[in-house]
């Protein structure tokens, strides 16, 4: 390797002689699951290849149109009926989906209690309206847990551990809506902003009351499950403070808090974890788990790019290396997944809904997006290795490495997220010189492609096909 090429190379290191922790598959989960219609064995196999530990049920009602699944208004469709009477519930379709997820895909279930997102505009709401009777909804939630964990209403004894109260109550006009809308009204921008702030405060106060009501009800009957939420849109400190304060005053402890993160900055996600831990500890909930249960790459155009109607903006959002599901997105995922393993996070769920389209893993022709190959690549690491070994990245390059349970296999994942270096030098301790290695490359031109890379003098050199994002797995 010449001096000139060294100037265009990042240098990272791995020490297989130094163990620093254990791999945690629970940090590699998703919302992807089976569907009632159009879910072939091929689709099941594709989901399995991505290797998710658990499946979160949020938005499954959207992916299963015309079916009564998961959402509480589907499970208990006539709200004025008696919630303690098992004959008033409709569980069959949800039973079928969860059974397929558990048995066919092999995932654990993370059950979101509440409703799927409702993009019906600022004034028209149906399922996402704030419930009139919090106690009634809490009783419906209890009936749901009882059905799946205790066999009630011709149910099951599946021992589903995690139950989440609602989703994104802080999201305007989609999830926790006032009857006359969440946007402010008034004759001037100032009046509208003031009224909007009033509505937001009211919505937050109502949700804190609802959250505590449901938490108390579920923990009183089911002390063995973990209950929490509420899957905020992001690590929103003011909202979490209000929620944790309400729990403390009610003397009920959430088992976990959850939030979402859509960004193109990996460190922003890691920073949100540190903030979550700090907040829970501050309010005395030191055993409260931290869960990010929606996360996804969001390109430089943000949500404006995703929802734009401008053909030029849409083309940049959905096509090329920097697109929503392109190689930058995939290497962002691999960077984040690697960092999760040594963070204070307890669980993480990559957001996917439907199999094709914006939030899928393939296009309408069945061609896999780059993110599919990246998620499959991480699965090969987290499910093959047991012990995390010491490693050090550099700049845009992130490294995670480890050994199998019996110590015979060693693996390394090297991810360069939007870097400009043409080569990556990997220095390795703990592997005898000259030992054969197997390398898989993932970049804008290659999808999970085996390449030959010699290992000599305690190092190997990974060559990128071009500047930008790329990832490699190395196996000894």
Where are these regions (language model features)?
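Noncatalytic carbohydrate-binding groove/subsite architecture in carbohydrate-active enzymes
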Residues: 198-333, 343
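Aromatic/acidic polysaccharide-binding cleft in carbohydrate-active enzymes
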Residues: 296-400
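Carbohydrate-binding surface patches
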Residues: 394-433, 437-444, 469-472
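Conserved, mostly hydrophobic/aromatic
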Residues: 30, 101, 144, 163, ...
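C-terminal beta-strand-rich structural cap/linker in extracellular carbohydrate-active enzymes
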Residues: 452-476
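Substrate-binding cleft and catalytic face of glycoside hydrolase catalytic domains
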Residues: 50-264
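Short, acidic/polar
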Residues: 35-47, 147, 237-248, 329-337
């Amino acid at each position: 390797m010449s001096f000139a090429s060294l100037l265009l190379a990042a240098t990272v290191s791995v020490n297989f002689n130094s163990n620093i922790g254990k791999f945690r598959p629970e940090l590699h989960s998703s919302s992807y699951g089976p569907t009632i219609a159009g879910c072939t064995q091929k689709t099941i196999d594709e989901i399995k290849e991505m290797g998710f530990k658990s499946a979160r049920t949020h938005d499954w009602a959207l992916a299963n149109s015309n079916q009564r699944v998961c959402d509480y208004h589907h499970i208990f469709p006539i709200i004025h009926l008696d919630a303690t009477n098992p004959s008033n519930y409709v569980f069959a379709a949800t039973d079928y989906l969860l059974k397929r997820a558990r048995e066919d895909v092999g995932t654990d279930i993370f059950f979101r209690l509440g409703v799927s997102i409702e993009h019906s505009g600022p004034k028209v709401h149906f399922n996402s309206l704030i419930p009139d009777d919090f106690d009634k909804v809490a009783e419906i939630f209890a009936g749901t847990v009882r059905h799946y964990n205790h066999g009630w209403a011709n149910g099951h004894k599946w021992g589903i551990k995690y139950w989440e109260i609602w989703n994104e109550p802080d999201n305007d006009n989609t999830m926790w809506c006032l009857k006359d809308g969440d946007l402010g009204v008034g004759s001037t921008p100032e009046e509208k902003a003031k009224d909007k702030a009033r509505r937001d405060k009211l919505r937050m106060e109502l949700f804190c009351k609802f959250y505590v009501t449901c938490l108390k009800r579920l923990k009183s009957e089911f002390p063995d499950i973990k209950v929490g939420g509420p899957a905020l849109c992001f690590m929103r400190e003011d909202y979490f403070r209000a929620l944790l304060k309400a729990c403390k005053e009610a003397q009920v402890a959430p088992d976990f808090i959850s939030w979402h993160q859509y960004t193109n900055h990996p460190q922003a996600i890691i920073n949100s974890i540190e903030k979550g831990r700090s907040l829970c500890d501050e309010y005395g909930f030191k055993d409260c788990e931290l869960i990010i249960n929606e996360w996804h790459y969001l390109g430089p155009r943000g949500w404006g790019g995703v929802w734009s109607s401008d053909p030029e903006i849409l083309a940049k959002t959905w096509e090329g290396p920097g697109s929503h599901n392109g190689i930058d997105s995939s290497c962002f995922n691999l960077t984040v997944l690697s960092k999760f393993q040594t963070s204070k996070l307890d669980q993480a769920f990559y957001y996917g809904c439907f199999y094709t389209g914006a939030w899928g893993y393939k296009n309408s022709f069945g061609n896999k997006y780059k993110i599919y190959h990246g998620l499959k690549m991480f699965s090969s690491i987290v499910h093959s290795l047991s012990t995390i070994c010491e490693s050090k990245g550099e700049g845009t390059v992130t490294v995670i490495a480890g050994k199998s349970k019996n110590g015979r296999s060693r693996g390394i994942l090297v991810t360069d997220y939007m870097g400009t270096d043409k080569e990556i030098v990997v220095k390795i301790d703990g592997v005898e010189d000259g030992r054969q290695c197997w390398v898989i490359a993932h970049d804008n031109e290659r999808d999970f492609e085996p390449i030959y890379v010699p290992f000599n003098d305690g190092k190997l050199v990974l060559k990128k096909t071009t500047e930008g994002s790329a990832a490699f797995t190395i196996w000894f």
